[in-house]
Amino acid sequence: QALPPMGRASSISRTGGTDRMGEPVLVGDVGGTNVRFALAERRGGKVEISDFSKLSGDSFETFAAALRRYLQDTGLEPKHACFAMAGPVRDGEVMLTNRDWHVSARHLCEVFGFDDIKIINDFTAMARSVPEHSGDYFEEILPGKEIPELPVIVAGPGTGFGVASLFPLGDDAWQVLTGEGGHIAYAPRDALEFDIASVLMRTQGYVSNELVASGMGLEFVHRAFCEVFGRNLEDISPEEMRHRADEGDEMFDQLIAMRAKAVMGAVGDLALANGALGGVVLAGGVTERIVDYLRRPESVARFRERGPMSGYLANCPVRLMHDPEAPLIGAAAYYAQETLK
């Protein structure tokens, strides 16, 4: 039961289809920045989504308000839903990590009249989407040969830093385990990283991989670099930082390189700890913008160099998944699989 691009995967369709299987499911992807909704159905083995909408989280005081806007705008009256939320989920409830929203499945059922709602971690959905994608959605970062029966790590920085482990169960079924792996402590490995980490420890306290590599931590990392390099702090965008790095600005080049090495070191740690020789799949907007930095020799070394165990990850492939709607696909696949139990 290998993952794409080597093995089989259900294809994804966003229009049309026949052989309807099951009732439509409202799916949502709720991150620290945006809220995405769509209606999902599985037809003939394909997950199909329609009525897609992307809303800014800042425009709403609560998740329920965003959901109400979507339902009003589309006129849909779904009875089943699965929402992927960026935060730890317990007993059908979640407090978002990077937004002050508390969401309860029971409360939403009472307010909106759903028959059932499943709330899952956003990276549970991201991970569950991986086997639903064909090889066209994947870009190779590090070549290798996966061992199909072993776990896969799915991770990546966006606003935060999501992490999940994907286990093949056979018969096209998958188990996803999530925690808060992005909050594992950051491990500096060279002099500059120790200097930056020292500043972050003084200003932020606990220094996690999420703080170093994700969107929410970029401002703090930028401040630390300015202090270490003796530069004045400027209010500039991530795009401008990248532009300056491309133009030869050493500080911004080193800043992006440190974040890329943090990503590769983190997923290497996770693969090592989980025996995840099924491969690593990266996702998230930050990752897509630093692909060239992820391929640098020093980033590759962070993934593979493990002292006496350096050979362990030598053939473990790393791929980047390109699909902004992946969590919606994964939420639908998760709901369908759980409903069939």
Task: Cite the ranges covered by each PLM segment.
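A short alpha->loop->secondary-structure connector
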Residues: S134-F138, G170-H183
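A short, charged helix-loop
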Residues: G179-R202
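ATP-dependent carbohydrate kinase catalytic cores
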Residues: D116-I147, E239-A260, G265
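Short beta-strand scaffold segments in enzyme catalytic cores
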Residues: V35-L39, V154-G156, F161-F167
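Short beta-strand-loop/turn "lid" adjacent to the catalytic site in phosphate-handling enzymes
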Residues: Q72-I119, T124, R128-Y137, V154, ...
